[in-house]
A protein has these predicted regions:
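Short helix-loop boundary/capping segments at the starts of domains
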Residues: 52-60
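A sequence-level detector of short, solvent-exposed, charge-rich linear segments
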Residues: 26, 48, 65-69
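Short, flexible, solvent-exposed loop/turn segments with mixed acidic/basic and small polar residues
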Residues: 24-29, 57
């Protein structure tokens, strides 16, 4: 079993695996209007992936973390850096990376995708398709309180 992690606002704990956030906002790996759940290969990377979008005004938000167990029988599709467009790390994200994952979401080939992190390319983000049939096989942990260390808020 492979483990992935997700961090979400505590007020969305019951909705953290619906993919509803993707309906309202685009992300590096999807177009707005698509259900997707973002996870990461480590808890530290999950924290960084959230924290890069925050500033001091967000210091009072309550967060939760989820452990995600991906059983061996659940296929994981992977995109290697060599398969990505030259602009894949640009900020803001370009449409080229959004289209790659959007095609994967539409295809329904796998519930789990592994892509390099734009923050730390040697590590992986784990987009999850909550509408794919294997999604129900994932072991979604209970929400646990998560707190960003106060030294991070500069």
């Amino acid at each position: 079993m492979i483990t992935a992690w997700r961090i979400a606002k505590a007020r969305y704990r019951d909705d953290a695996f619906s993919g509803n956030g993707g309906l309202q906002n685009a992300g590096r790996w999807h177009l707005q209007g698509q259900r997707v759940v973002y996870g990461a290969s480590s808890l530290a990377l999950a924290a960084l992936e959230v924290f890069v979008h925050l500033n001091r005004a967000h210091a009072g938000i309550r967060w939760v973390m989820f452990e995600i167990g991906i059983p061996d029988e659940v296929p994981i599709e992977a995109l290697a850096k060599a398969q990505l467009p030259r602009t894949w790390r640009h900020n803001p994200p370009t449409g080229s990376t959004m289209r790659l994952d959007s095609e994967w979401l539409r295809s329904g080939r796998a519930a789990v995708l592994r892509v390099p992190s734009a923050i730390i390319p040697a590590e992986s983000n784990i987009p999850i398709n909550p509408q794919q049939t294997d999604f129900g096989k994932l072991k979604l942990g209970r929400p646990q309180a998560f707190e960003f260390d106060s030294r991070l808020w500069k």
